[in-house]
Each structure stands twice: as structure tokens, then as C-alpha cells.
Amino acid sequence: MSAKDVKFHDSARSRIVKGVNVLADAVKVTLGPKGRNVLIERSFGAPTITKDGVSVAKEIELKDRFENMGAQVVKQVASKTADVAGDGTTTATVLAQSIVQEGMKHVAAGMNPMDLKRGIDKAVAAVLDELHRLSKPIKTSREIAQVGAISANADEAIGKIIADAMDKVGKEGVITVEDGKSLENELEVVEGMQFDRGYLSPYFINDPDKQVAHLDDPLILLHDKKISSIRDLLPVLEAAAKAGKPLLIIAEDVEGEALTTLVVNSMRGVLKVAAVKAPGFGDRRKALLEDIAILTGATVISEETGKQLEKATLEELGRAKRVEVQKENTIIIDGAGDQTRIDARVKAIRAQIEEATSDYDREKLQERVAKLAGGVAVIKVGAATEVEMKEKKDRVDDALHATRAAVEEGIVPGGGVALLRARSAISSLTGANADQDAGIRIVLRALEAPLRVIAANAGDEPSVVVAKVLSGKGNYGYNAATGEYGDLVETGVVDPTKVTRTALQNAASIAGLILTTDATVAEAPKEEKAVPAPAPELEY
């Protein structure tokens, strides 16, 4: 086991804070409509230009091991916020930096870190309640477009295309982002269904760049039991090979020799095949398999209906134009099912929704309707160069996640104003002691940080902007894109409540952990042994 380097107290915390600041300072230049670009070197090919906070955070690794710990911890804030809300990564990083910096001053002054953390947690809980109170639901296509545009760094074209996609496939429909072939963004809508089960083996992948298995015009086998014997599968495999078509197997599970044989055939190119687990559990799995069967024109091979896998015929297999199997999702596009049967199935599920008593059942039934009736919208991102295409795709992904979050939990005024208004919930809040009061004041100051950074990136004086916004009420705030003050909701400067909430929660959580850290352990640098100089050559 290699030797470790251990640091305690202030010497440990100061190095962590240095790492936090390096990462946060690199990320926060991207915040707001006037945010700057960050140029990232690649080990091969052209450098990447981005205004996406999480993309910048992911690239940062520091040479000093102790500083790197601080940077990596804050990187978690950005990636966790991106995973949950899809946006707000830069805001979360700015909030975390502010709480850590202010908190460290109090810790250095001798305050109890645990009480500071209790004060911070108490203040954050009150602010989250206030954000929910300020939130308003999102209804119109125009509001969806506004949220998308803000999240895509004030790109209205991206906001509009996302709103159009949601109009076409519904708010619950599946929307994917692909590389376009022209300079303009394009929207393509195809019938399809997505469920949350991915490939059973990574060896089924045939597109290594995207880490997915693409099957064009495949046959689809649906089975409600485990498949472990290859003998049971042989008739279907032979039928698919004769037809010269790829095969998608959806079953309770595929294991043992059956899975091994499928992997070997796939790798050798004998048969393009992918196997996935059936979605859901119990009765819900049966219902979802039946949905897929109706969508693709298949018959579920089930003992309940007297069907046996070893006697399955080509007519009992479903068909689709294309199937995309990802690590955790499968998308069936343009199934060959009969439209009248699909409509009847949707009608039957809608009747079940009316009779459903629990919210959970109702939600799951609505998901099934969306998958059967909604389809898949594909946004094709257009750009002049590959570098621009990658940067634009990142922004479209962000905007798409943000609009979904807005539909889910509503919107609040953007531009850091919602957090500033939420200060009213904690301005008179007190803790159990002076140290907890200090924790509350730390959050009070941190809530100004996003607006200060937005103003600084736009070239304005942060203190003047904060004072002017605080002099107004409600949605009154600073529009950094135009440099004007006014009602931000009316002018379309809005943030999804979920994004703002998640950013603050994650920032406070990680900052609290850093403040209560008293020792750091890292691998000690290895001492390089000096290479002896070569002996001089003798002259003859």
C-alpha cells in the first residue's frame, strides 16, 4: 500500500478552498446571457468551445492532490444538478463557492462548523419553501419556448424548436437530439415508444461512439418468461437469419447459454441482435408487453395464451422501422402495428385513468398513453462546423431538460432574482445560538451571488445591480441580455423552479460537508530516483 499524505485543520481546509475556487472561477464565467466562452484542449483534434458549465467542470483536474479534492467535490454539485434538473450547474457552483468562502471565514474565526451547518440547513429549508410559493405553473407553448431560450444561453431558435416538439408529441413524449445535415435546426417527428430498460450486454453495441445498438427494420420477439436455453430460441434465430433481418428480444430475462450464444453471433456478425429485459414488474409488465405487441404487430409468447417459445413463428414477431437500444433505455420507432388497435388500446387505458384511485397508478397509466400515442420527436441540430455543432448540441440538451423541469414544477423569475426575493423568508430567521445565526447569514449573502456573477459577466457593477433589484418587488429584476430592468416573467427571463431548487440544495449539501471537514488524506507523491549519468566513452 502506498504512503499517504495527511493534513489537518486549517492547512487541510485552505487547500480544499483553493481547489473549489479554481473550478468555480472557471465555471462561473459562463453564467448568464453575456457569459463568456471557455476553450478546452483535446488530446487529439480541435479544441472544444463551450458555454456549458458542467462541460467545463468535467474537464478540470488539478495537479495538487489536496486542491483537486476540493475541485472534485464541487464538480459533484454541477454533475448532480445536471442529472436531476438538466440545468443550473453554473448557478449551483456559484452558490457552493459563496457558501464555502463565507463559511470558512467563520470557521477560521473559531465558530463551530456543525452549528454553522445547522444554520445553513435551516435557512435553505426556508428558502426552498419560499421558492415553491413564488413558483407559477407553465401552460402555454410561448412560456415553454421562453424557458428553453433562457437555458440555451438566450437562443430563441432553440426555445422555439423545443416548444414545437412538445406540441407535436405532448409534454410527456420522447424528444431526442441528433446531428443535423444542414446549417439550420430541424424537427422530425416519428411514431415511437421508449421504455427504461437497456441492453443486457455491452457486446450488443454496434455504434461505439454513441454507445448504443442500432437495429434497422428489425423483427421483435416478446416473451414473458426467462430465456436460458438456446434450444428454445433456435427457431426464432433461424427465422431471423433466413429473413436477413436484425432481431430484438424483449423477455423477463435472457441468461446463461442463451445470452452467450446471442453475444457470440452478434460479435461475429452472423446475426445483428440485441436482448433487453421487459419493462415493469408483475401485472404492469404484462400490460407493457401487450402495449409493445400492439405497437409492433407482435404476439406476446406466453404460456397463459398457450404459446411456446420453441414453436414461435415469423408471423408472431413484431416489426418496426428502427430500434435504438441504449445503456438504460430502448426506443422503438415507427412500429408496424395496426392503427385501429393502437387507438382502441389508448382508449381503454384512458378509461382506466378515469377509474384510477391512486396518483401513482394514474401517473403510470398516463405514461403508457404517452408512449403509445405520443411518438418520438427528433431535433436535428444544424451548424457550420463540428466544433459549433457540439457546443450547440450541449445547449439544446440543457434547454430540453430545463423545459421538462419547468413543466414538472413550474417557473420562477430568472436572472438570480428568485433567490434574491427568497431572502425575505430568512431575513428575520434565527437559530438556536450565535453560530447558527451566522450560518443563516451565510445563506443570506450566498443568495446574492448568482445575480452578482451575471451582472459582472455583462460588464455591470454587481453591487449597483443588486441594490437596484432589491429596491423593486416581485418579478422586477435585471435583464442582462438587454441591460434593462423590468418584469422578468413578462420579458421571458424565467427559470424552472426545479432547477433553482436543485442548485441550492446540492450547493448547500456539498458546502456543508466541506465546512465540517477537519482532515484530508491523499496519496504521497512518489520520490523519483535520480538516473545515474552514463559513464564517459573512452577515447582510443
UniProtKB/Swiss-Prot annotation:
List the GO cellular component terms: cytoplasm
Biological-process GO terms, alphabetical? protein refolding
- What are this entry's molecular-function GO terms? ATP binding; ATP-dependent protein folding chaperone; isomerase activity; unfolded protein binding
By sequence similarity, the record places it as follows: Belongs to the chaperonin (HSP60) family.
What job does the chain carry out? Answer: Together with its co-chaperonin GroES, plays an essential role in assisting protein folding. The GroEL-GroES system forms a nano-cage that allows encapsulation of the non-native substrate proteins and provides a physical environment optimized to promote and accelerate protein folding.
Q: What PANTHER family does this protein map onto?
A: 60 KDA HEAT SHOCK PROTEIN, MITOCHONDRIAL
> Per its record, how is this protein called by name?
Chaperonin GroEL 2/3
